[in-house]
Structure formats: C-alpha cells, structure tokens
Amino acid sequence: MSTYVLIHGSWHTGAEWEGVARALRERGHEVHTPTVAGHGKNVPKNVNHADCVQSILDYIIDANLSDIILLGHSYGGTIIARVFEEAPERIRRLIWWNAFVPAPGNSLMDEVPPHYRGLFEALAQASDDNTVTMPFPIWRENFINDGDLATAEETYVLLSSEPFQPFVDKLPLDRFYANIGNIGRSYINAMEDIALPPGEWGWHPRMSSRLMGPRLVQLPGSHEVMFTNPDLLAEKIIEAGRD
C-alpha cells in the first residue's frame, strides 16, 4: 500500500480532507493531511509562501516520511512544487488535482484571471490582517457548483480567511522545471471545475501541459468534489498514484 500526503488549497485546512482520507484508509493506504502554515481559524496569518512550504517540509521530516505520493489541490500545487525542489528524495510521485503549476517566476496571482486579481487585492486591502475571505456567491457558483445549497452552506462555514502574501510571492521554480521529468507525475482534472473559467484561464490543459506529459486522470465534479463525492475522488487519487 502507499503513503499519501494530501496538501489542501486556499481557505481550507487538512481537516477538510476527512472524507477522502477515510476512503483511502479503508482501501489500506496510509494518509497524512497536514495543515499549511497560516491556514485555519484563530491562527497567525502573517506568513509568506516560504513559510507555507517550510511547514509541510517540517511535517514530512518530523514524521520521517519517505516514498510518499504528494498531492496538491489548487493553491497546494504551488506548495508541492517547492517541496519537490527541497526534498525530492522523499517523494515517489507528485499529483496535482485541479492545482496550480506556476510558470517559472510567476506568483499565484499571475496565474489567475484579472477579475480574481482585482477581487483578491480589494479583499486583502479591506481586511485588517492582509487576508482574503471567500465570498459565498463565488463559493456557491464557481467552487462547489456540483453540490446543493445545503452542502454549499455546510461547507462554507468550514472555510477560513486566506493569507494574501503567499498569493503574490514570486516562485522561480528553476529546480522544479529542471527535474520534473525525472519523477512520476499525474494531473487529476475534475471536469465541472469552473473555479478557474474554462478556456484561456482554465486548469486543463493550461496547467497540466507544464508537467511534460503527466498521467491524466479525469472525473466528473467541481473544484470541491472532495465534499460532494469523496469516494470517487479517492478512487481517482489511487489511479493517479499507481506505479
């Protein structure tokens, strides 16, 4: 069986992987769901991208994990790219699930469409701690569009404000792009995911094509299929993670 380390996206913590992690464990796998620094409620938000990466590196090293399948969702894709640069010897395969694969030197903000840039900047400036709070209409219509209203409301209360600084930090990723061809890599694409609008700014093939021929695994569902169909997502993670 395999060891999975699942890295959440923006506005989430490791706790939101509960349904997926349970399904993976029921199938015999070891699963870790650490929370990235600065994420969650009632925690310090003054972190940068390097702090976020270091928190996951520390978790992996402290738990003495090796031969791991490291998965990043959404913003978590930027984290796993950097973790791969710092600890490639601990990783067996990388998986991006509708996740960012930034172009060399780009920040996450460089990779989102202009309407999101303006919104995130305005929300961060309006906050008292340089964070971005997810507006419910965007959550309902663009992130969890495959769920009913009750599911959208129940999951929305789990979200927490997102530190803005990691969104704007530039990521050179020189070592990532120099070595990505030397490790197994997969891209999971939820086909109803419109968190990034399909087309010019969409997830696939824009992000997946940067991985130099990854294994592509697709499934029905939204950006938050972890809530709406965790069992199916777990099956697709196993498919993406197989040797």
Model-derived segments and their meaning:
Residues E85, I91, I95-F136, P166-D169:
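Flexible "cap/lid" loop of the alpha/beta hydrolase fold
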Residues D129-N182:
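Conserved alpha/beta-hydrolase catalytic His-Asp/Glu region
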Residues F227-G241:
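Post-His helix in hydrolase/transferase enzymes
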